[in-house]
C-alpha cells in the first residue's frame, strides 16, 4: 500500500469514528435524520443504518414523495403554508377591511407618522411576497402532479389556470372536456387529446390530498392578493395623488412598496427609477430581456406601454423624471389635488406625440435660371504671363495626337509605358512655336525697347543670340550646319559660273601700247 492510500484510510477511520460518536451522543433521532438525508441525496442506505432502523416503519407516502416534501407534510404543513398561516398576513387583511369602509382624509403632517400610510406600504410589500409564494407553490404542484400528467405543465402556463385544471382532473383524466369549461376550447381539446396518450400513472390518495390542498392555497392567496391590491389602489390616489396621476395607481403602489415608502422613493435619482422592480418582473415571469432590457415597474406603466416600441426608451426617461418630481412633491403634501401630476403627464404625452411625428418634408425648390452672360475673366500682365507659361506646347499637342493607320511609338519611363503620338513620325519635321494672341501678347516697355535699339545701333554686327546652326530636314532630322562650308560652297558656285565667261578669257597683248594716244 502506498503512502497516499494509507493517508486516505486514516481519514476514513477518523470520519467513521466521528460519525459514530455523534450518533451515540444524539441517540436514535440522529440515525433517523441520517437515513432521511441519505434518501434525499439518493445515495442509498448504509449497512449500519439498515441494521439499526426498520425500513418498513417508513411510510409509503414518504417513499413516493420527495423527501423534502414528506418531511414538511409530517410537520402538519406548517413549513409549506407559512405565509398563508402567518399572523402578518391576517393583520394586514384585517387592517384593509377596517379602513376600506372609511374615507381617507388628506395627510397634513409628516407622512411617515400616518398609520394608514404604513399599512399601505406593508400591504404592497406583502403583495409582492404573495407573488413569490404563489410561484413556489406552483412549482411544488407541478413537481407532484408530474407523475400523473407530465404534459400538462407545458399546455397550461398560468399558475391559477394550472391549479384549477389540476383540482378538476386529479386522477380522473376522462371526460376532461366537461371539467375544464373555464379554459379556452382549443386548450381543452389539446388537453383531452394529450390525456389519452399520457404516460403518467395514478397518484396515491395522500398525494392527491396534498396536491388539492396546495391548489386551494394558491387560489386563496390569489384572492387575498386581489383584495390587497384593490385597497392599495383605492388609497394610493390620496397618499400620492401626483404620482398616481403620472403613472397610475398600480405602478405608483409598486414603486412606493419596492422603494420602502414615498419619502425614500423621492430620494431616488431619476436615472435609477426605471430599474426598480426588474427582479420582481423577472420572478413573476413578466420581464422579457429582449423587449424590456433593464426596466422594471415603470416599463409596465400605462403611459409607457401604449407607446410604440421604438420610442419606449425615450418615454421611460421622460416619465422617470416626472415620477421623481411627483414623489418629492407628494412627500411634502404639495398639490394635494394632483394638478402637478396631471400637467406632468400631459407634458410627457405631448413630447411622445412630438417624437412620433413624421419628419418634415423639404419643399421642392426650383433650379435657378442659368446665367448665360459672358463671365468676367481676369487679365493683366501677370495673368497673361502665367497663361503663356502653362500653355500647351506644340510637342504636347503632337504627343496627344495619333495618326490614323500608323503605329504609335512608345517609350518606357519608370516601369511605365508612355505613348509619343505623332512625335517622330516620318514627314513631320516641323515644330511650330506656340501661337500667341496679339491682343494678349506680352509687350516690352518703351524704355526697354529704346535701350535695345540703342544697343543695336552701336554694334550692328552683334548677333542677337537667337541664331542657330541647327537645321531640321525630313531625311536626316536635325543637322549641324557649318558656316565655313556654306561660304566655300558659295565660292565654288561663283567660280563655276564665271569660269566659262567671255570676258574672263580675253588675253591681253603685251606689245600693245597702254595708251593709244601716246
Curated annotation (Swiss-Prot):
GO molecular function terms listed in the Swiss-Prot or TrEMBL record: RNA binding
Nop domain: residues covered: 239-357
One GO biological process term: mRNA cis splicing, via spliceosome
SUPFAM superfamilies in alphabetical order: Nop domain (SSF89124)
Region (Disordered): 359-382
Alphabetical list of Gene3D superfamilies matching this protein: 1.10.287.4070, Nop domain
UniProt-listed InterPro entries: Nop_C, Nop_dom, Nop_dom_sf, NOSIC, Prp31, Prp31_C
Chief place where the protein resides: nucleus
Cellular location(s): Nucleus
Biological function: Required for spliceosome assembly where it is needed to link the U4/U6XU5 tri-snRNP to the prespliceosome complexes.
Protein name, UniProt field: Pre-mRNA-processing factor 31
Biological classification of the source: Eukaryota, Fungi, Dikarya, Ascomycota, Taphrinomycotina
Gene symbol of the encoding locus: prp31
Amino acid at each position: 500500500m502506498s503512502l497516499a492510500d494509507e493517508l486516505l484510510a486514516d481519514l476514513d477511520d477518523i470520519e467513521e469514528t466521528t460519525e459514530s460518536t455523534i450518533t451515540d451522543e444524539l441517540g436514535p433521532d440522529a440515525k433517523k435524520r441520517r437515513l432521511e438525508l441519505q434518501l434525499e441525496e439518493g445515495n442509498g442506505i448504509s449497512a449500519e443504518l439498515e441494521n439499526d432502523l426498520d425500513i418498513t416503519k417508513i411510510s409509503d407516502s414518504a417513499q413516493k414523495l420527495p423527501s423534502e416534501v414528506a418531511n414538511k407534510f409530517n410537520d402538519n404543513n406548517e413549513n409549506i403554508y407559512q405565509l398563508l398561516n402567518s399572523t402578518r398576513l391576517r393583520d394586514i387583511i384585517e387592517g384593509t377591511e377596517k379602513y376600506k369602509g372609511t374615507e381617507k382624509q388628506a395627510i397634513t403632517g409628516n407622512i411617515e407618522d400616518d398609520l394608514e400610510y404604513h399599512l399601505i406600504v406593508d400591504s404592497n410589500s406583502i403583495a409582492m411576497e404573495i407573488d413569490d409564494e404563489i410561484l413556489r407553490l406552483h412549482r411544488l404542484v407541478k413537481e407532484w402532479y408530474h407523475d400523473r400528467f407530465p404534459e400538462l405543465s407545458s399546455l397550461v402556463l398560468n399558475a391559477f389556470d394550472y391549479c384549477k385544471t389540476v383540482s378538476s382532473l386529479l386522477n380522473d383524466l376522462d371526460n376532461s372536456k366537461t371539467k375544464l369549461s373555464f379554459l379556452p376550447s382549443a386548450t381543452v381539446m389539446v388537453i383531452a387529446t394529450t390525456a389519452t396518450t399520457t404516460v403518467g400513472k395514478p397518484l396515491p390518495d395522500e398525494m392527491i390530498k396534498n396536491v388539492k390542498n396546495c391548489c386551494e392555497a394558491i387560489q386563496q392567496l390569489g384572492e387575498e392578493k386581489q383584495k390587497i391590491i384593490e385597497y392599495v389602489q383605492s388609497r394610493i390616489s390620496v397618499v400620492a395623488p401626483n404620482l398616481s396621476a403620472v403613472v397610475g395607481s398600480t405602478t405608483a403602489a409598486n414603486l412606493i412598496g419596492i422603494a420602502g415608502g414615498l419619502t425614500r422613493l423621492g430620494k431616488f435619482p431619476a436615472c435609477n427609477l426605471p430599474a426598480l422592480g426588474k427582479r420582481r418582473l423577472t420572478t413573476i415571469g413578466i420581464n422579457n430581456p429582449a423587449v424590456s432590457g433593464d426596466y422594471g415597474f415603470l416599463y409596465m406603466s400605462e403611459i409607457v406601454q401604449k407607446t410604440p416600441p421604438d420610442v419606449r426608451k425615450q418615454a421611460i426617461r421622460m416619465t422617470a423624471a416626472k415620477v421623481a418630481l411627483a414623489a418629492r412633491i407628494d412627500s411634502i403634501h404639495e398639490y394635494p389635488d394632483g394638478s402637478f401630476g396631471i400637467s406632468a403627464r400631459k407634458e410627457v404625452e405631448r413630447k411622445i406625440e412630438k417624437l412620433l411625428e413624421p419628419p418634415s418634408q423639404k419643399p421642392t425648390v426650383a433650379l435657378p435660371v442659368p446665367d448665360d452672360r459672358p463671365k468676367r475673366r481676369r487679365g493683366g500682365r501677370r495673368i497673361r504671363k502665367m497663361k503663356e507659361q502653362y500653355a500647351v506646347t506644340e510637342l504636347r499637342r503632337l504627343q496627344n495626337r495619333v495618326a490614323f493607320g500608323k503605329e504609335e511609338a512608345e517609350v518606357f519611363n519608370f516601369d511605365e509605358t508612355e505613348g509619343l503620338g505623332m512625335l517622330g513620325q516620318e514627314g513631320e519635321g516641323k515644330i511650330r512655336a506656340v501661337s500667341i494672341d496679339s491682343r494678349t501678347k506680352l509687350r516690352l516697355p518703351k524704355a526697354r525697347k529704346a535701350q535695345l535699339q540703342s544697343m543695336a545701333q552701336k554694334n550692328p554686327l552683334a548677333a542677337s543670340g537667337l541664331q542657330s546652326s541647327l537645321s531640321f530636314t525630313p531625311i536626316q532630322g536635325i543637322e549641324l550646319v557649318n558656316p565655313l562650308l556654306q561660304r566655300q560652297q558659295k565660292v565654288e558656285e561663283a567660280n563655276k559660273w564665271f569660269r566659262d565667261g567671255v570676258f574672263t578669257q580675253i588675253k591681253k597683248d603685251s606689245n600693245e601700247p597702254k595708251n593709244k594716244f601716246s
